[in-house]
Amino acid sequence: MAGEGVVSTYVLAQELEGTCGNVHSTFRSSMNVQADGFLLHIGATTDSLSCLGIAIPENEIKTLLKWTRRGDLAFLSKGVLRIYSRAGATRIEYGDFKPVDTTVPPLGDGWCVDVLRSAIAAIDFCGETGLPPSQDLAWVLRDLSCAALGARGVESVRAAARFLVGRGLGLTPSGDDFLAGYGTALRARSLKDLLAGFSMDELSERTTDVSAAYLRAMAEGHANSAFIDLVRSLRVGDGDLCQGTVAEICSVGHTSGHDSLLGFVVGIGLLESIGGPGCFACESRTGRIAS
């Protein structure tokens, strides 16, 4: 597998030379390798590129997944990832892959929020998020929205992050996906003082390895390629690109895409456009507000 894939600039910036590890987890169309504390995602070029990863042709990832099991050995050296599965050694020469910049670009002046407002108009975030509705959640979303709009400070972000981290099920709990999206929006808006509310030493101990890796990448200014495209669509006011990217994000996982998009929307300052914090205090998805 040489020269046929893409690799994130975040991966290329890591010191992975000579590291050993193993297959951490496998999914329907992707997998994770953990080496020397770094979680490397391997996906298909037909999907959005993970900021933690590399992507290879779809037929090749399918073949790799067919023979690979959790715990299989992996070794990285000179831009080559070797995975030792039941089929033998597979070489992925990611050093020859096309690099994709996963650095979150600044929105700058004159960006267009209306294209995002239009793209999310039909999404039922209250029904699609994996975060259980509660009055506490409503308060947290209100505080994060106020912080994004300049009416709250970094302590509100810090308290909200403690509430959300690890909240939910799966390898990337819904609260973590939300925080990744929210932090990406803050980065795009150059609100670096609020980003200080993400204390990675504390947060990483309270969630999964996978979530901790994505939150760490977010804190260092990186995001998955779909979110990079989303920020770019707002910079230039491209409604079609925004609509397509929102759909792409929403297709990720069971609720992960909606959770991360919700965080981004709140970080951009559009919580009121999707019903405000009150709808997330519902006891059920039918709209009854918790007392």
Residue positions per predicted region:
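Conserved phosphate/anionic-ligand binding catalytic regions in large, soluble enzymes, centered on
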Residues: 170-187, 256-268
